[in-house]
Structure formats: C-alpha cells, structure tokens
Amino acid sequence: MKQAIVARTDIGMGEGKLAAQVAHASLSAYQDAGRRVRKKWQGEGQKKVVLKGDSESQLFELADKADKEGIPYAIIRDAGHTQLEPGTVTALAVGPARDDTVDRVTGDLSLY
C-alpha cells in the first residue's frame, strides 16, 4: 500500500510551502480512506512518494482517474496567506491504496 502526492511545479512554491501542501494533501486523503485501509497502511509503514505535477488541469485529471478507480484522494487549495493567491490548487494526494492501483493513476509522473 502507498500514497502518492502530486505537487505542482508550475507555481513556484518555496520549500516550506511545498512541505506544508504535501502534508495537507496526505492527511486529507488519509482521512477519506476507510478504517481498514488506514489501519493496513499504518501497519505497513505509511509508504509515500511525492511526484511532480505540471498544472492545475493535470491534478484534476488525475483526481478523476483516482475517483474512477475508487481510490481516496484529496485536492488541496491554498488559503493565500503567504506566497500564493487564495484558492490556488497546489497538490493532490492519491491513496492510500494498493501500489498497483495508485500506479495506474500516477505511474507516469516523475519524482519530485
């Protein structure tokens, strides 16, 4: 089991902003997963990978694929208090779910 977090590279997030957005995405998708999935993922070490996304539209396309696969996912919008405009889509988390299922959604993306 794993979770993939896709962070946008086209909006110039600083390292701290990137870390916060990835964390928001991870926790949000985790909360949407079923109890069994959460427990299994926790028991297996909560494997995660952070991947590069190139646009808002790409994140929404990936979210649609995750939805069709029945995978928990979360799209994160920034509050706009620091670097970005309010409502800017920054990240997408896919999973936790089986590795092969997550890979069907995010397998073509590069590591961040």
Curated annotation (Swiss-Prot):
Gene3D superfamilies: Bit1. Keywords: Cytoplasm, Hydrolase. It catalyses: an N-acyl-L-alpha-aminoacyl-tRNA + H2O = an N-acyl-L-amino acid + a tRNA + H(+). InterPro entries: Pep_tRNA_hydro_II_dom_sf (IPR023476), Pept_tRNA_hydro_arch (IPR034759), PTH2 (IPR002833). One of its GO terms (molecular function) is peptidyl-tRNA hydrolase activity. SUPFAM superfamilies: Peptidyl-tRNA hydrolase II (SSF102462). Pfam families: PTH2. It is an enzyme of class 3 (hydrolase). One of its GO terms (cellular component) is cytosol. Its EC number is 3.1.1.29. It comes from the Archaea. It is found in: Cytoplasm. One of its GO terms (biological process) is translation. The natural substrate for this enzyme may be peptidyl-tRNAs which drop off the ribosome during protein synthesis. NCBIfam families: arch_pth2, PRK04322.1. Belongs to the PTH2 family. PANTHER family: PEPTIDYL-TRNA HYDROLASE 2, PEPTIDYL-TRNA HYDROLASE 2, MITOCHONDRIAL. This is Peptidyl-tRNA hydrolase. It comes from Halorubrum lacusprofundi (strain ATCC 49239 / DSM 5036 / JCM 8891 / ACAM 34). The lineage of its organism: Archaea, Methanobacteriati, Methanobacteriota, Stenosarchaea group, Halobacteria.
